Amino acid sequence: MKCHYEALGVRRDASEEELKKAYRKLALKWHPDKNLDNAAEAAEQFKLIQAAYDVLSDPQERAWYDNHREALLKGGLDGEYQDDSLDLLHYFTVTCYSGYGDDEKGFYTVYRNVFEMIAKEELESALEEDMEDFPTFGDSQSDYDTVVHPFYAYWQSFCTQKNFAWKEEYDTRQASNRWEKRAMEKENKKIRDKARKEKNELVRQLVAFIRKRDRRVQAHRKLVEEQNAEKARKAEAMRRQQKLKQAKLAEQYREQSWMAVADLEKELREMEAQYEKQFGDGSGEDEAEDQELRDGQDGKDSDEAEDAELYDGLYCPACDKSFKTEKAMRNHEKSKKHREMVALLKQQLEEEEANFSGPQTDENSLNANSEEEMEDAPKQKLSRKQKKKKQKPAQNYDDNFNENGIGEGVKIDPEDTNLNQNSAKESEDSLQENVGVTETVELCDDPKTEAKSVSKPKGKKAKDTKKSVRVPAEPQTMSDVLISCTTCHSEFPSRNKLFDHLKATGHARAPSSSTSLNSVTNSRNKKEKRKNR
Protein backbone atom coordinates (compact mmCIF):
# COMPACT_ATOMS: atom_id res chain seq x y z
CA MET A 1 0.00 0.00 0.00
CA LYS A 2 1.25 3.43 -0.92
CA CYS A 3 1.01 6.42 1.40
CA HIS A 4 -1.70 8.91 0.45
CA TYR A 5 0.63 11.87 0.96
CA GLU A 6 3.19 10.27 -1.36
CA ALA A 7 0.47 9.57 -3.95
CA LEU A 8 -0.45 13.27 -4.04
CA GLY A 9 3.15 14.41 -3.65
CA VAL A 10 2.53 16.70 -0.64
CA ARG A 11 3.81 16.96 2.90
CA ARG A 12 1.98 15.44 5.84
CA ASP A 13 1.05 18.87 7.17
CA ALA A 14 -0.26 20.19 3.83
CA SER A 15 -3.32 22.44 3.88
CA GLU A 16 -6.59 21.87 2.01
CA GLU A 17 -5.62 24.32 -0.74
CA GLU A 18 -2.34 22.53 -1.30
CA LEU A 19 -4.13 19.17 -1.43
CA LYS A 20 -6.65 20.51 -3.95
CA LYS A 21 -3.98 21.96 -6.22
CA ALA A 22 -1.93 18.76 -6.15
CA TYR A 23 -4.98 16.63 -6.89
CA ARG A 24 -6.04 18.71 -9.93
CA LYS A 25 -2.55 18.71 -11.31
CA LEU A 26 -2.11 14.93 -11.00
CA ALA A 27 -5.66 14.23 -12.20
CA LEU A 28 -5.00 16.11 -15.44
CA LYS A 29 -1.72 14.31 -15.83
CA TRP A 30 -2.97 10.73 -15.22
CA HIS A 31 -6.51 10.94 -16.51
CA PRO A 32 -7.20 7.91 -18.83
CA ASP A 33 -8.59 10.08 -21.61
CA LYS A 34 -5.30 11.90 -21.88
CA ASN A 35 -3.15 8.76 -21.74
CA LEU A 36 -4.54 6.59 -24.51
CA ASP A 37 -1.17 5.04 -25.24
CA ASN A 38 -0.82 3.77 -21.63
CA ALA A 39 -4.43 3.57 -20.53
CA ALA A 40 -4.06 0.71 -17.98
CA GLU A 41 -1.24 2.29 -15.97
CA ALA A 42 -2.90 5.70 -16.13
CA ALA A 43 -6.19 4.26 -14.85
CA GLU A 44 -4.42 2.54 -11.89
CA GLN A 45 -2.52 5.66 -10.97
CA PHE A 46 -5.64 7.80 -11.29
CA LYS A 47 -7.47 5.52 -8.82
CA LEU A 48 -4.70 5.93 -6.21
CA ILE A 49 -4.77 9.70 -6.63
CA GLN A 50 -8.53 9.84 -6.33
CA ALA A 51 -8.57 7.54 -3.25
CA ALA A 52 -5.86 9.59 -1.54
CA TYR A 53 -7.71 12.85 -2.13
CA ASP A 54 -11.01 11.37 -0.90
CA VAL A 55 -9.38 10.41 2.42
CA LEU A 56 -7.28 13.52 2.98
CA SER A 57 -9.99 16.00 1.95
CA ASP A 58 -12.25 14.79 4.80
CA PRO A 59 -10.93 16.10 8.18
CA GLN A 60 -12.15 13.08 10.17
CA GLU A 61 -10.80 10.55 7.64
CA ARG A 62 -7.50 12.38 7.51
CA ALA A 63 -7.16 12.41 11.31
CA TRP A 64 -7.84 8.69 11.52
CA TYR A 65 -5.39 8.00 8.69
CA ASP A 66 -2.66 10.04 10.41
CA ASN A 67 -3.08 8.00 13.59
CA HIS A 68 -3.00 4.64 11.80
CA ARG A 69 -0.74 5.46 8.88
CA GLU A 70 2.19 3.37 10.04
CA ALA A 71 0.04 0.32 10.74
CA LEU A 72 -1.73 0.61 7.39
CA LEU A 73 1.53 0.86 5.49
CA LYS A 74 2.98 -2.19 7.26
CA GLY A 75 0.19 -4.69 6.93
CA GLY A 76 -3.15 -3.19 7.96
CA LEU A 77 -5.26 -3.44 11.12
CA ASP A 78 -6.26 -7.10 10.83
CA GLY A 79 -3.36 -8.41 12.96
CA GLU A 80 -1.03 -9.00 10.06
CA TYR A 81 1.15 -5.99 10.92
CA GLN A 82 4.87 -6.73 10.91
CA ASP A 83 6.92 -4.47 13.18
CA ASP A 84 10.29 -4.06 11.48
CA SER A 85 11.72 -1.65 14.09
CA LEU A 86 15.07 -2.38 15.72
CA ASP A 87 15.03 -4.92 18.55
CA LEU A 88 16.97 -3.24 21.37
CA LEU A 89 17.06 -6.28 23.64
CA HIS A 90 19.98 -7.73 21.65
CA TYR A 91 22.18 -4.79 22.73
CA PHE A 92 21.88 -5.28 26.48
CA THR A 93 24.80 -7.78 26.50
CA VAL A 94 28.56 -7.33 26.27
CA THR A 95 28.74 -9.93 23.49
CA CYS A 96 27.31 -7.50 20.93
CA TYR A 97 30.66 -5.66 20.76
CA SER A 98 34.34 -6.55 21.04
CA GLY A 99 36.70 -4.03 22.60
CA TYR A 100 36.51 -0.27 22.96
CA GLY A 101 38.09 0.66 19.66
CA ASP A 102 36.66 2.45 16.66
CA ASP A 103 36.59 -0.65 14.42
CA GLU A 104 33.39 -2.16 13.00
CA LYS A 105 32.81 -4.47 16.01
CA GLY A 106 34.01 -1.98 18.57
CA PHE A 107 31.94 -0.51 21.41
CA TYR A 108 31.53 2.98 19.99
CA THR A 109 30.80 1.89 16.39
CA VAL A 110 28.11 -0.65 17.35
CA TYR A 111 26.14 1.68 19.65
CA ARG A 112 26.56 4.64 17.32
CA ASN A 113 24.78 2.65 14.60
CA VAL A 114 22.03 1.62 17.04
CA PHE A 115 21.12 5.20 17.97
CA GLU A 116 21.27 6.32 14.35
CA MET A 117 18.66 3.68 13.45
CA ILE A 118 16.42 4.77 16.36
CA ALA A 119 16.66 8.37 15.20
CA LYS A 120 15.72 7.35 11.64
CA GLU A 121 12.60 5.54 12.86
CA GLU A 122 11.58 8.57 14.88
CA LEU A 123 11.98 10.86 11.90
CA GLU A 124 9.73 8.63 9.80
CA SER A 125 6.98 8.71 12.43
CA ALA A 126 7.22 12.39 13.34
CA LEU A 127 5.69 15.31 11.52
CA GLU A 128 7.91 17.85 9.89
CA GLU A 129 7.23 20.49 12.54
CA ASP A 130 8.14 17.96 15.27
CA MET A 131 11.42 16.91 13.69
CA GLU A 132 14.54 17.65 15.70
CA ASP A 133 18.22 16.91 15.58
CA PHE A 134 19.33 13.83 17.47
CA PRO A 135 22.80 14.11 19.08
CA THR A 136 25.30 11.50 17.87
CA PHE A 137 27.12 8.97 20.03
CA GLY A 138 30.59 9.89 18.76
CA ASP A 139 33.77 7.80 18.98
CA SER A 140 36.50 7.02 21.48
CA GLN A 141 38.20 10.40 20.96
CA SER A 142 35.11 12.59 21.24
CA ASP A 143 35.17 15.48 23.68
CA TYR A 144 33.06 15.04 26.77
CA ASP A 145 31.63 18.56 26.98
CA THR A 146 30.70 18.92 23.30
CA VAL A 147 29.67 15.34 22.33
CA VAL A 148 29.38 12.89 25.21
CA HIS A 149 27.50 15.07 27.71
CA PRO A 150 24.85 16.36 25.19
CA PHE A 151 24.27 12.77 23.95
CA TYR A 152 23.49 11.35 27.39
CA ALA A 153 21.53 14.46 28.44
CA TYR A 154 19.11 13.96 25.51
CA TRP A 155 18.75 10.19 25.40
CA GLN A 156 18.33 9.78 29.17
CA SER A 157 15.03 11.69 28.84
CA PHE A 158 14.01 10.21 25.48
CA CYS A 159 10.33 10.28 24.40
CA THR A 160 9.28 8.50 21.20
CA GLN A 161 7.20 10.15 18.47
CA LYS A 162 5.54 6.91 17.40
CA ASN A 163 1.82 6.56 18.06
CA PHE A 164 1.73 2.72 18.09
CA ALA A 165 -1.59 2.65 16.24
CA TRP A 166 -0.96 -0.97 15.18
CA LYS A 167 -1.41 -1.94 18.84
CA GLU A 168 -5.07 -0.89 18.83
CA GLU A 169 -7.71 -3.57 19.35
CA TYR A 170 -10.82 -1.75 18.06
CA ASP A 171 -11.63 -0.13 14.73
CA THR A 172 -13.56 3.00 15.53
CA ARG A 173 -15.05 3.04 12.03
CA GLN A 174 -17.13 0.03 12.97
CA ALA A 175 -18.84 1.76 15.91
CA SER A 176 -22.64 2.02 15.67
CA ASN A 177 -22.95 5.31 17.61
CA ARG A 178 -20.77 7.98 19.06
CA TRP A 179 -20.83 6.57 22.62
CA GLU A 180 -19.49 3.28 21.39
CA LYS A 181 -16.90 5.11 19.31
CA ARG A 182 -15.75 7.10 22.34
CA ALA A 183 -15.40 3.93 24.39
CA MET A 184 -13.30 2.34 21.62
CA GLU A 185 -11.09 5.41 21.38
CA LYS A 186 -10.58 5.39 25.14
CA GLU A 187 -9.46 1.75 25.18
CA ASN A 188 -7.21 2.24 22.14
CA LYS A 189 -5.60 5.27 23.80
CA LYS A 190 -4.76 3.24 26.90
CA ILE A 191 -3.09 0.60 24.75
CA ARG A 192 -1.09 3.16 22.77
CA ASP A 193 0.08 4.98 25.89
CA LYS A 194 1.22 1.71 27.44
CA ALA A 195 3.21 0.76 24.32
CA ARG A 196 4.77 4.25 24.14
CA LYS A 197 5.81 4.08 27.80
CA GLU A 198 7.43 0.67 27.30
CA LYS A 199 9.39 2.00 24.34
CA ASN A 200 10.67 5.03 26.27
CA GLU A 201 11.75 2.93 29.25
CA LEU A 202 13.53 0.46 26.99
CA VAL A 203 15.58 3.19 25.30
CA ARG A 204 16.44 4.87 28.63
CA GLN A 205 17.57 1.58 30.16
CA LEU A 206 19.81 0.95 27.16
CA VAL A 207 21.36 4.42 27.61
CA ALA A 208 22.05 3.69 31.29
CA PHE A 209 23.63 0.33 30.34
CA ILE A 210 25.93 2.01 27.80
CA ARG A 211 26.86 4.96 30.07
CA LYS A 212 27.96 2.64 32.82
CA ARG A 213 30.49 1.01 30.46
CA ASP A 214 31.54 4.08 28.52
CA ARG A 215 35.22 4.73 29.27
CA ARG A 216 34.88 8.36 28.28
CA VAL A 217 32.43 8.85 31.13
CA GLN A 218 34.69 6.96 33.52
CA ALA A 219 37.68 9.11 32.59
CA HIS A 220 35.67 12.27 33.08
CA ARG A 221 34.36 11.08 36.44
CA LYS A 222 37.92 10.41 37.59
CA LEU A 223 38.99 13.85 36.40
CA VAL A 224 36.13 15.49 38.27
CA GLU A 225 37.04 13.63 41.46
CA GLU A 226 40.62 14.83 41.20
CA GLN A 227 39.46 18.39 40.63
CA ASN A 228 37.13 18.22 43.61
CA ALA A 229 39.91 16.85 45.80
CA GLU A 230 42.20 19.66 44.70
CA LYS A 231 39.49 22.23 45.43
CA ALA A 232 38.96 20.71 48.86
CA ARG A 233 42.70 20.93 49.63
CA LYS A 234 42.80 24.56 48.51
CA ALA A 235 39.71 25.40 50.54
CA GLU A 236 41.22 23.77 53.64
CA ALA A 237 44.48 25.65 53.18
CA MET A 238 42.61 28.93 52.72
CA ARG A 239 40.53 28.24 55.81
CA ARG A 240 43.65 27.64 57.87
CA GLN A 241 45.25 30.82 56.60
CA GLN A 242 42.13 32.79 57.40
CA LYS A 243 42.03 31.31 60.88
CA LEU A 244 45.68 32.23 61.53
CA LYS A 245 45.06 35.72 60.22
CA GLN A 246 42.08 36.17 62.53
CA ALA A 247 44.13 34.92 65.48
CA LYS A 248 46.84 37.49 64.76
CA LEU A 249 44.26 40.25 64.47
CA ALA A 250 42.76 39.17 67.78
CA GLU A 251 46.16 39.43 69.47
CA GLN A 252 46.74 42.89 68.04
CA TYR A 253 43.25 44.10 68.81
CA ARG A 254 42.90 46.96 71.25
CA GLU A 255 39.60 48.35 72.40
CA GLN A 256 38.90 51.81 71.06
CA SER A 257 38.21 54.67 73.40
CA TRP A 258 34.74 55.25 72.01
CA MET A 259 33.84 51.58 72.63
CA ALA A 260 34.73 51.62 76.34
CA VAL A 261 31.67 51.28 78.57
CA ALA A 262 33.18 53.40 81.32
CA ASP A 263 33.68 56.32 78.96
CA LEU A 264 30.13 55.96 77.70
CA GLU A 265 28.76 56.08 81.23
CA LYS A 266 30.86 59.14 82.00
CA GLU A 267 29.67 60.89 78.86
CA LEU A 268 26.08 59.98 79.70
CA ARG A 269 26.38 61.52 83.15
CA GLU A 270 27.84 64.70 81.65
CA MET A 271 24.94 64.91 79.19
CA GLU A 272 22.43 64.44 82.01
CA ALA A 273 24.10 67.19 84.04
CA GLN A 274 24.05 69.52 81.04
CA TYR A 275 20.36 68.90 80.35
CA GLU A 276 19.56 69.33 84.04
CA LYS A 277 21.39 72.65 84.08
CA GLN A 278 19.65 73.86 80.93
CA PHE A 279 16.08 72.63 81.43
CA GLY A 280 15.83 72.44 85.18
CA ASP A 281 16.17 69.74 87.78
CA GLY A 282 13.63 67.35 86.27
CA SER A 283 15.92 64.43 86.96
CA GLY A 284 16.37 65.67 90.52
CA GLU A 285 12.63 65.46 90.99
CA ASP A 286 12.64 61.85 89.84
CA GLU A 287 15.49 61.04 92.21
CA ALA A 288 13.63 62.79 95.03
CA GLU A 289 10.49 60.77 94.29
CA ASP A 290 12.45 57.52 94.30
CA GLN A 291 14.11 58.44 97.57
CA GLU A 292 10.77 59.33 99.15
CA LEU A 293 9.26 56.03 98.02
CA ARG A 294 12.21 54.11 99.48
CA ASP A 295 12.03 56.01 102.76
CA GLY A 296 8.25 55.54 103.00
CA GLN A 297 7.39 59.23 103.34
CA ASP A 298 3.90 60.53 103.09
CA GLY A 299 2.56 61.16 99.55
CA LYS A 300 1.09 64.53 100.47
CA ASP A 301 4.44 65.88 101.66
CA SER A 302 6.14 64.85 98.41
CA ASP A 303 3.36 66.50 96.35
CA GLU A 304 3.70 69.73 98.31
CA ALA A 305 7.47 69.73 97.81
CA GLU A 306 7.08 69.16 94.08
CA ASP A 307 4.46 71.94 93.81
CA ALA A 308 6.70 74.34 95.72
CA GLU A 309 9.61 73.61 93.38
CA LEU A 310 7.41 73.77 90.29
CA TYR A 311 5.64 77.04 91.09
CA ASP A 312 8.59 78.77 92.70
CA GLY A 313 8.94 81.91 90.62
CA LEU A 314 7.71 80.30 87.39
CA TYR A 315 3.94 80.34 87.98
CA CYS A 316 1.39 82.85 86.69
CA PRO A 317 -1.60 83.03 89.09
CA ALA A 318 -3.64 85.18 86.73
CA CYS A 319 -3.51 82.61 83.88
CA ASP A 320 -3.00 79.53 86.10
CA LYS A 321 0.03 78.37 84.13
CA SER A 322 3.50 77.12 85.10
CA PHE A 323 6.69 77.41 83.06
CA LYS A 324 9.97 75.52 82.95
CA THR A 325 12.31 78.42 82.19
CA GLU A 326 12.47 82.09 83.05
CA LYS A 327 12.56 83.00 79.38
CA ALA A 328 9.20 81.34 78.81
CA MET A 329 7.80 83.16 81.84
CA ARG A 330 9.00 86.53 80.53
CA ASN A 331 7.53 85.87 77.08
CA HIS A 332 4.21 84.99 78.68
CA GLU A 333 4.17 88.19 80.75
CA LYS A 334 4.59 90.21 77.54
CA SER A 335 1.63 88.54 75.85
CA LYS A 336 -1.68 90.36 75.32
CA LYS A 337 -3.73 87.61 76.90
CA HIS A 338 -1.72 87.78 80.12
CA ARG A 339 -2.20 91.54 80.38
CA GLU A 340 -5.94 91.17 79.90
CA MET A 341 -6.15 88.49 82.56
CA VAL A 342 -4.17 90.62 85.02
CA ALA A 343 -6.43 93.63 84.40
CA LEU A 344 -9.53 91.50 84.85
CA LEU A 345 -8.17 89.99 88.03
CA LYS A 346 -7.47 93.43 89.45
CA GLN A 347 -11.04 94.49 88.74
CA GLN A 348 -12.37 91.39 90.44
CA LEU A 349 -10.22 92.04 93.48
CA GLU A 350 -11.39 95.64 93.68
CA GLU A 351 -15.01 94.52 93.57
CA GLU A 352 -14.40 91.93 96.27
CA GLU A 353 -12.68 94.48 98.46
CA ALA A 354 -15.58 96.89 97.97
CA ASN A 355 -18.23 94.25 98.73
CA PHE A 356 -16.74 92.22 101.56
CA SER A 357 -14.43 94.53 103.50
CA GLY A 358 -15.77 96.26 106.70
CA PRO A 359 -14.90 99.68 108.10
CA GLN A 360 -12.68 98.24 110.83
CA THR A 361 -10.73 95.89 108.54
CA ASP A 362 -7.09 96.81 108.67
CA GLU A 363 -4.71 96.87 105.75
CA ASN A 364 -2.83 93.73 106.81
CA SER A 365 -5.93 91.52 106.77
CA LEU A 366 -7.04 93.09 103.46
CA ASN A 367 -3.70 92.33 101.82
CA ALA A 368 -3.71 88.76 103.13
CA ASN A 369 -7.21 88.14 101.79
CA SER A 370 -6.26 89.66 98.45
CA GLU A 371 -3.27 87.33 98.11
CA GLU A 372 -5.39 84.29 98.94
CA GLU A 373 -8.06 85.36 96.46
CA MET A 374 -5.42 85.89 93.75
CA GLU A 375 -4.26 82.33 94.23
CA ASP A 376 -7.78 80.85 94.22
CA ALA A 377 -9.38 83.07 91.59
CA PRO A 378 -8.12 81.29 88.42
CA LYS A 379 -9.22 77.92 89.75
CA GLN A 380 -12.87 78.87 90.42
CA LYS A 381 -15.81 79.41 88.12
CA LEU A 382 -18.90 81.58 88.56
CA SER A 383 -22.42 80.68 87.75
CA ARG A 384 -24.76 83.23 86.20
CA LYS A 385 -26.74 83.67 89.41
CA GLN A 386 -23.61 84.19 91.48
CA LYS A 387 -22.34 86.81 89.03
CA LYS A 388 -25.64 88.69 89.30
CA LYS A 389 -25.50 88.54 93.08
CA LYS A 390 -21.90 89.75 93.01
CA GLN A 391 -22.66 92.72 90.77
CA LYS A 392 -25.86 93.98 92.48
CA PRO A 393 -25.71 93.30 96.22
CA ALA A 394 -25.60 96.88 97.39
CA GLN A 395 -28.19 98.07 94.91
CA ASN A 396 -30.85 95.79 96.46
CA TYR A 397 -30.25 97.25 99.88
CA ASP A 398 -30.39 100.80 98.59
CA ASP A 399 -33.66 100.14 96.79
CA ASN A 400 -35.22 98.69 99.93
CA PHE A 401 -34.12 101.67 101.95
CA ASN A 402 -35.39 104.19 99.42
CA GLU A 403 -38.79 102.52 99.04
CA ASN A 404 -39.56 102.56 102.75
CA GLY A 405 -38.10 106.00 103.35
CA ILE A 406 -36.00 104.91 106.26
CA GLY A 407 -32.37 104.39 106.91
CA GLU A 408 -31.32 107.79 108.08
CA GLY A 409 -32.18 107.28 111.73
CA VAL A 410 -30.95 103.72 112.06
CA LYS A 411 -27.86 103.14 114.06
CA ILE A 412 -25.29 100.36 113.45
CA ASP A 413 -24.19 98.01 116.18
CA PRO A 414 -20.82 96.25 115.63
CA GLU A 415 -21.74 93.33 117.87
CA ASP A 416 -24.40 91.77 115.61
CA THR A 417 -22.63 91.32 112.23
CA ASN A 418 -23.21 87.63 111.54
CA LEU A 419 -26.83 86.56 111.98
CA ASN A 420 -27.70 82.92 112.38
CA GLN A 421 -30.72 81.20 110.96
CA ASN A 422 -32.56 81.00 114.30
CA SER A 423 -32.57 84.76 114.78
CA ALA A 424 -33.82 85.20 111.21
CA LYS A 425 -36.76 82.88 111.87
CA GLU A 426 -37.62 84.68 115.13
CA SER A 427 -37.60 88.04 113.40
CA GLU A 428 -39.92 86.70 110.71
CA ASP A 429 -42.41 85.45 113.33
CA SER A 430 -42.35 88.70 115.19
CA LEU A 431 -42.90 90.71 112.02
CA GLN A 432 -46.07 88.75 111.36
CA GLU A 433 -47.39 90.20 114.66
CA ASN A 434 -46.89 93.75 113.29
CA VAL A 435 -43.67 94.36 115.16
CA GLY A 436 -42.40 97.87 114.41
CA VAL A 437 -38.71 97.44 114.23
CA THR A 438 -36.38 99.00 111.74
CA GLU A 439 -33.10 97.48 110.80
CA THR A 440 -30.68 99.12 108.49
CA VAL A 441 -27.48 97.73 107.09
CA GLU A 442 -24.90 100.09 105.76
CA LEU A 443 -21.88 98.89 103.85
CA CYS A 444 -18.50 100.42 104.39
CA ASP A 445 -17.89 101.66 100.89
CA ASP A 446 -19.70 104.38 99.05
CA PRO A 447 -22.87 103.18 97.25
CA LYS A 448 -21.83 105.10 94.21
CA THR A 449 -18.65 103.06 93.97
CA GLU A 450 -20.60 99.84 94.38
CA ALA A 451 -23.14 100.76 91.72
CA LYS A 452 -20.55 101.35 89.05
CA SER A 453 -20.47 98.70 86.39
CA VAL A 454 -17.16 97.09 85.62
CA SER A 455 -16.12 97.09 81.98
CA LYS A 456 -15.82 93.56 80.68
CA PRO A 457 -14.35 92.18 77.46
CA LYS A 458 -16.80 91.11 74.79
CA GLY A 459 -17.05 88.05 72.59
CA LYS A 460 -14.61 85.16 72.95
CA LYS A 461 -12.47 87.03 75.48
CA ALA A 462 -15.44 87.32 77.83
CA LYS A 463 -16.00 83.55 77.62
CA ASP A 464 -12.34 82.85 78.35
CA THR A 465 -12.46 85.27 81.25
CA LYS A 466 -15.51 83.55 82.73
CA LYS A 467 -13.78 80.18 82.48
CA SER A 468 -10.44 81.26 83.90
CA VAL A 469 -11.55 83.65 86.68
CA ARG A 470 -13.67 82.35 89.49
CA VAL A 471 -14.77 84.40 92.50
CA PRO A 472 -15.77 82.52 95.63
CA ALA A 473 -19.46 82.88 96.35
CA GLU A 474 -19.55 83.74 100.03
CA PRO A 475 -22.42 85.26 101.98
CA GLN A 476 -22.21 89.01 102.19
CA THR A 477 -21.12 90.14 105.63
CA MET A 478 -22.87 93.16 107.06
CA SER A 479 -21.15 95.84 109.03
CA ASP A 480 -22.09 96.81 112.53
CA VAL A 481 -25.87 96.70 113.16
CA LEU A 482 -27.73 98.59 115.93
CA ILE A 483 -31.29 97.57 116.94
CA SER A 484 -33.58 100.20 118.56
CA CYS A 485 -37.27 100.75 119.25
CA THR A 486 -38.89 103.28 116.94
CA THR A 487 -41.40 104.38 119.56
CA CYS A 488 -39.21 105.17 122.56
CA HIS A 489 -35.83 105.06 120.75
CA SER A 490 -34.37 102.63 123.28
CA GLU A 491 -31.32 100.70 122.07
CA PHE A 492 -30.87 96.96 122.59
CA PRO A 493 -27.83 94.74 122.03
CA SER A 494 -29.86 91.89 120.53
CA ARG A 495 -33.20 91.07 119.00
CA ASN A 496 -34.26 88.98 121.96
CA LYS A 497 -33.97 92.02 124.22
CA LEU A 498 -35.93 94.07 121.72
CA PHE A 499 -38.70 91.46 121.51
CA ASP A 500 -38.99 91.33 125.30
CA HIS A 501 -39.27 95.13 125.40
CA LEU A 502 -41.97 95.16 122.71
CA LYS A 503 -44.04 92.52 124.47
CA ALA A 504 -43.78 94.32 127.77
CA THR A 505 -44.49 97.88 126.59
CA GLY A 506 -46.75 97.25 123.62
CA HIS A 507 -44.69 99.42 121.29
CA ALA A 508 -45.15 96.90 118.43
CA ARG A 509 -48.06 98.83 116.89
CA ALA A 510 -46.14 101.17 114.65
CA PRO A 511 -47.41 100.53 111.08
CA SER A 512 -44.69 102.46 109.24
CA SER A 513 -41.78 100.41 110.57
CA SER A 514 -43.25 96.99 109.78
CA THR A 515 -43.15 97.59 106.07
CA SER A 516 -39.49 98.55 106.06
CA LEU A 517 -38.50 95.65 108.27
CA ASN A 518 -40.47 93.21 106.13
CA SER A 519 -38.68 94.41 103.01
CA VAL A 520 -35.28 94.02 104.67
CA THR A 521 -35.95 90.56 106.05
CA ASN A 522 -37.56 89.36 102.81
CA SER A 523 -34.54 90.40 100.79
CA ARG A 524 -32.27 88.65 103.28
CA ASN A 525 -34.35 85.47 103.21
CA LYS A 526 -34.19 85.40 99.42
CA LYS A 527 -30.41 85.64 99.56
CA GLU A 528 -30.24 82.84 102.13
CA LYS A 529 -32.37 80.60 99.87
CA ARG A 530 -30.12 81.34 96.90
CA LYS A 531 -27.06 80.42 98.92
CA ASN A 532 -28.65 77.18 100.07
CA ARG A 533 -29.22 76.19 96.44
From Swiss-Prot:
Organism equals Bos taurus (Bovine)
Question: Where on the tree of life does the source sit, at the highest rank?
Answer: Eukaryota
Can you quote a single GO CC term? nucleolus
The protein's predominant localisation is cytoplasm
Q: Where in the cell is the protein located? A: Cytoplasm; Nucleus; Nucleus, Nucleolus
Keyword Metal-binding annotated: yes
Quote the Gene3D superfamilies the UniProt record gives.
Answer: Classic Zinc Finger, DnaJ domain
Output one GO MF annotation.
Answer: nucleic acid binding
Composition bias of kind Low complexity appears in 512-523
Put simply, this protein is called DnaJ homolog subfamily C member 21
State what this protein does.
May act as a co-chaperone for HSP70. May play a role in ribosomal RNA (rRNA) biogenesis, possibly in the maturation of the 60S subunit. Binds the precursor 45S rRNA.
Q: Where is the composition biased (Basic residues)?
A: 381-392, 455-464, 524-533
Q: Where is the composition biased (Basic and acidic residues)?
A: 291-302
Query: Mind listing the UniProt keywords for this protein, alphabetically?
Result: Chaperone, Cytoplasm, Metal-binding, Nucleus, Phosphoprotein, Repeat, Zinc, Zinc-finger
Zinc fingers, C2H2-type, are found at 315-339, 484-508
What residue spans carry the region label Disordered? Answer: 278-311, 327-473, 503-533
Q: Which InterPro entries match?
A: Chaperone_stress_response, DnaJ_domain, DnaJ_domain_CS, J_dom_sf, Matrin/U1-like-C_Znf_C2H2, Znf_C2H2_jaz, Znf_C2H2_sf, Znf_C2H2_type
